[in-house]
Amino acid sequence: MNPNKRLLSLDVLRGITVAGMILVNNTGKCGYNFAAFAHAKWDGFSPADLVFPMFMFLMGISTYISLCKYNFQCRPAIAKIIKRSLLLIFIGLVMEWFITSIDSGNYFDLSQLRLMGVMQRLGICYGITALLAVTIPHKRFMPLAIILLVVYFIFQLFGNGFEKSVDNIVGMIDSAILGANHMYLQGRQFVDPEGILSTIPAVSQVMIGFVCGKIIIDIKDNDRRMLNLFLIGTTLLFVGYLLSYACPLNKRLWSPSFVLLTCGIAALSLALLLYIIDVKQNKKWFSFFEAFGANPLVIYVFSCIAGGLLVHWHIHTAVFSNLLNPLFGNYFGSFMYGVFFLLFNGLLGYVLLKRKIYIKL
């Protein structure tokens, strides 16, 4: 496949994940979520837990595609890699500052600024994966990804790393390096879901996506391409499920079993969409998600800022309490708020797509 040609199935799957992230993060009222749109409180797995790791997996694929133009040579690619990684981290910090500031009303108080977050994790994991891509043979990627998962599992195994307690090594490292005030919810949940130690398995997530990106680009035959994705996805899903008996599925800890399971689901989902969209050319049913997937990071950042402003201006509460709750009730009304907010963000995506504007960070 030509790496300069946009892969519609990849855009669509990215769009599905971004739409899912917006729905999960923007409900009408906290606590009134359908189970599918609520994260597992600790151990366990729900559809809501899938969207972010799937996006990271897809970022691994995009990393392979974007570095093809540099032929994976370090010298020409290094400036782009560092610039993009730092930009993602910077945007994440600005977003955290903005949300914290409008809540407190103090735009100069950084004492409770969350240092890690979704964009920061994307920036760090992209940077590490991309630097590895231009410095080591790609055949070592999958073994290295597995080694990182094993190392993290050992940390968890011998550091009480599966328990929701103050002596969990994952949370202890987050607290020691970041400080409780700079963690998610000021450390009240013991660990930061995008924390320091759990970045290790998150890098593995992106690296596995990178391997699948190599399959998509290097294998020219669609049948072989889909077969390879299917085999990898099935293997990862099966191993992740088996491993979950010894290593619980846990998004907050980004456990090794969670990485393997979600990578498996992502690979199988992409194989299915490749068949439906790129082979069978059934595209018309997916244009809605393409609008989100063509500019995923722009839509995500916009949704976070817009969502924060709607809460700050009390529009969020007014719409839910005075309109959606009386019409639909607590749970469905809360869900409908997310749907309307999703459509609102989709307008931006639609305009950018129709004008063929693709904003790359």
Task: Locate the predicted segments by residue.
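Alpha-helical transmembrane segments and their immediate juxtamembrane cytosolic regions
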Residues: 1-361
